[in-house]
């Protein structure tokens, strides 16, 4: 058992998962100060909920702080949960985070966290970009460095199914010319190798070659995604279900960084690709239940299914 000086044996045992995950690294320098950080306050109250901190770290790109608790970060947190855990678990995690934020609400920029994190134990519904809307987004010409970064990474994520954190790391060197496959090891699941066919229709190689761009924070990223969607006319009026309530708005208003992976999964599904294959390409392995949460549309029954129920043709 890894031990932290200043903690009792029982405390070391109680917080072992968090210690092993590196969340107690700053403890010994100043225990009192550490307990007043976001990580300290959350872990001290919920020692077994390292998963919540890991999700926030993936979203933000660094260890979460009070200052990181913005509207967009919390909305992406809810999106991530609803796509990767059961609705009942998402409700529990959100309630726990809400409790910690409520005790420290003067320290965070988000004033609407109670509403954002009020998740019911029911499934949510989100938007995706259709094949035509994907073409519109890909064709957009960025006007600033920030737009170039967001446009590039969103397109890579949308064309490969990679998480945002992985999309930023992918380059042309991840492509195999002989097999025309892109392969990489996800940051979230380092023991897995993901392989995806290179999308030649939308010029994926060009986006992969355009790397080393200056990153931006998640709030800015989502704002730019919505701006681009609005500029290219992705404005169909949509009604989605969030936290058990209907929300109606132009589609561009309902998009975020997560829309890229949803678009990848949903369009493949509508094209008839099996959930098992989509799961492999998204790094979910054999866990198709996780993949199902990224599917935002229903597809028609295969003609072979319909023919099965038809009477056999009699031969004359």
Regions found by a protein language model. Name each.
Residues 128, 187-190, 282-308:
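Catalytic-site neighborhood detector that most strongly recognizes the C-terminal catalytic loop/helix
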Residues 55, 83-115, 161-165, 226-228, ...:
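N-terminal DNA-binding recognition helix of tyrosine site-specific recombinases/integrases
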Residues 91, 115-164, 168:
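Basic, Lys/Arg- and aromatic-enriched nucleic-acid-binding interface segment
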Residues 308-316:
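C-terminal secondary-structure termini that scaffold catalytic or DNA-interacting sites
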Residues 226-280, 284:
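Short, basic (Lys/Arg/His-rich) helix/loop patches that form interaction surfaces
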Residues 5-84, 99-106, 113-115:
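Basic/aromatic-enriched alpha-helical hairpins
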Residues 169-206:
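Conserved tyrosine-mediated DNA breakage-rejoining catalytic core shared by Y-recombinases
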Residues 174-179, 273-293:
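Short, polar N-cap/turn motifs at the start of nucleic acid-interacting alpha helices
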